[in-house]
C-alpha cells in the first residue's frame, strides 16, 4: 500500500527593513536589512529613493512568512514596488502563507506604494496584512 502522507517541506522566510533619509535634496538609504528570500534593488539614481522588492522564492504558498517594513524619513521621498506580479500558489490543507507589510512616513515625507497585482492560484491560502 502506498503511503499518502507527505512531509511538509521547509517554507520560505524573508524580510526587508528599509528606511530613507534626506541628504541635501536627495532621498537616500538610511538603513537596509534583507533576509531569507527577500531582496531590494534600487534601479536608478534620482531625487526619490526607488525600491523594487524581489521575492527570490518566486511566490508564496502555505507556511511561507514574508515581512516588509519601510520607514520614510522626514522630508524624504520613496517609491516602492514589486518586481512582477505576486503569486499565491496552492497550499497544503491547514497551511497559510503570511505577508505582513508595515509602512510609516515621518513629517514631510512621501511614499508611493505601488505593488504589482496578486495572482491567486487554485487552493491558495494567503493572509496579508498592511499597516500604514
What are the roles of these predicted feature ranges?
Residues 94-132:
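Internal, conserved structured core segments that host functional sites
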